[in-house]
């Protein structure tokens, strides 16, 4: 997805990120960076981030682009590491694929990555705080990718569409937590019927103009909703509906192919 290069206007930041706290320096070219910042969009909450770098790469060159990895319910910034991101990035380097970084960030246990009635807005945290922070660290954020698991799969679709086709290089939604109705949604996923309607990803024009990949197991509880979502797209997305459930085992087996797709 990062081969789709173009000169793009940078996003306008509505709130500059608070100073981040980088981890202690390790090797000359570390494969992992960690830190945190206080997110105004999340109500002043300390927000941790983790960056997985492909071996031999660094952000300072200004050419490394990020894929934002959004965790599922009750997860955190480290979920992408549990899914095997570092091993998959190393494999891409061995195969000579274009390198990119994968960035995990805390979004809240049950936030569903959109503005809530409480005022907390993890989506704004990603777009208005995290992306400018990554830019200040030397990453090329003119175009970024999104991927996510479960709640984060929905979030990847939601935030990728919100950022728009000019900035979003690709979206990979893995076992996305999609609901065919408000009454079918999990308690706490949306604040009200109006909240569900306003933040639905079905029928969004932007998602027909952004490269998409959707993977979901046939035994996943979100299988039918994911099928319905895919069926209403103008162009069939990449990905597959294959044997598997809503679990880390399925996500680990799918990740190498998903990151290889992001690299194309």
Summary of predicted features, one role per range:
Residues 2-264:
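Non-catalytic cap/lid and distal C-terminal segments of serine-dependent acyl enzymes
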């Amino acid at each position: 997805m990062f081969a789709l290069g173009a000169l793009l206007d940078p996003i306008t930041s509505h709130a500059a990120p608070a100073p981040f706290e980088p981890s202690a320096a390790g090797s000359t070219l570390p494969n992992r960076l960690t830190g945190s910042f206080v997110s105004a969009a999340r109500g002043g909450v300390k927000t941790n981030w983790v960056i997985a770098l492909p071996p031999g790469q660094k952000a300072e060159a200004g050419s490394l682009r990020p894929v934002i990895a959004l965790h599922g319910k009750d997860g955190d910034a480290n979920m992408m590491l549990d899914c095997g991101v570092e091993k998959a990035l190393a494999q891409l380097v061995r195969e000579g694929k274009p390198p990119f970084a994968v960035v995990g960030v805390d979004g809240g246990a049950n936030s569903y990555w959109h503005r809530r009635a409480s005022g907390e807005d993890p989506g704004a945290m990603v777009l208005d705080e995290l992306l400018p922070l990554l830019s200040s660290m030397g990453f090329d954020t003119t175009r970024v990718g999104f991927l996510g698991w479960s709640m984060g799969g929905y979030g990847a679709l939601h935030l990728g569409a919100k950022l728009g086709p000019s900035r979003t290089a690709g979206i990979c939604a893995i076992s996305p937590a999609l609901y065919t109705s408000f009454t079918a949604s999990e308690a706490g996923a949306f604040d009200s019927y109006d909240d569900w309607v306003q933040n639905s990803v079905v029928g969004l024009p932007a998602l027909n103009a952004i490269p998409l990949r959707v993977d979901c197991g046939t035994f996943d509880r979100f299988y039918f909703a994911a099928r319905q979502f895919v069926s209403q797209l103008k162009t069939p997305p990449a990905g597959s509906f294959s044997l598997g459930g809503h679990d880390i085992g399925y996500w680990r087996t799918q990740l190498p192919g998903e990151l290889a797709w992001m690299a194309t």
